[in-house]
Curated annotation (Swiss-Prot):
Substrate binds at Y110. One of its GO terms (molecular function) is tRNA pseudouridine(38-40) synthase activity. It comes from Cupriavidus necator (strain ATCC 17699 / DSM 428 / KCTC 22496 / NCIMB 10442 / H16 / Stanier 337) (Ralstonia eutropha). Belongs to the tRNA pseudouridine synthase TruA family. This is tRNA pseudouridine synthase A. CDD domains: PseudoU_synth_EcTruA. InterPro entries: PsdUridine_synth_cat_dom_sf, PsdUridine_synth_TruA, PsdUridine_synth_TruA_a/b_dom, PsdUridine_synth_TruA_C, TruA/RsuA/RluB/E/F_N. Its EC number is 5.4.99.12. The gene is truA. It comes from the Bacteria. Keywords: Isomerase, tRNA processing. It catalyses: uridine(38/39/40) in tRNA = pseudouridine(38/39/40) in tRNA. It is an enzyme of class 5 (isomerase). The keyword tRNA processing applies.
Amino acid sequence: MNRIALGLHYDGAAFSGWQSQPHRNTVQDHLENAIERFAGVRLLTTVAGRTDTGVHALGQVIHLDTALEREPFSWVRGVNAFLPPSIALQWALPVDQGFHARFLAFERMYYYALYTGPHRVPLVHGRAGYQMLPPGQRLDVDAMREAAACLLGEHDFSAFRAAECQAKSPVKTMYDVTIRDDGNWVFLRFRASAFLHHMVRNLMGCLVAVGRGRYPAHWLAQVLAGRERKLAAPTFMPDGLYLVGVKYPDPYQIPAADPSASLFHGVFDDAA
């Protein structure tokens, strides 16, 4: 039996999240149907991170087991022929049976693209979050950065956890929160050992609230320490959220994600 790792991009705007559900339009169902048409047999996939409805991926990783003998690019070309335009494999890589897309991952990275201003921009609808601000007003990005500093390190992130979260522990390690602004755009990068359900979107709600001046920067540390979801801001919209990267031990040589063909082109190129 051969184990294959696959890299996947998708525009999540039209899908009910990653995970297969009866009578729902999910990324997993479309992918497994396409794989079946290519391989001639139903093959189950294991994913690095189950994204929610409306969330996108530039660096999703899956694995599957198969008896088929195919060249790596044959998987990419063949499966893509049966996928809708909003989903595409980027690479395929043979791996040993020790590889596991979910359990072997030691770091995950999400980006968020946020547009601010007095009116929405239809051309990025579904692909960027939006915060209405009066003409001439901007988010206080410096305050947002100050607030985000408390998130670094190992913490109990229960305050940012969805009620339906199935993670065994709320304790995660946040390695980095980088915030960049460019006119009406604000881009955020979150790197952590793993994320709880809705964790990034709940953090976004809090950071935007700080940026709007509704709370001081030190408020976020109080929310974190309180460990109660009711203390935090409402969950922010999924539209601008992208799973950009998943890291694995070096021997597996899993390709890094390439965000160049997205809203994030060049935004974090000089960030560590």
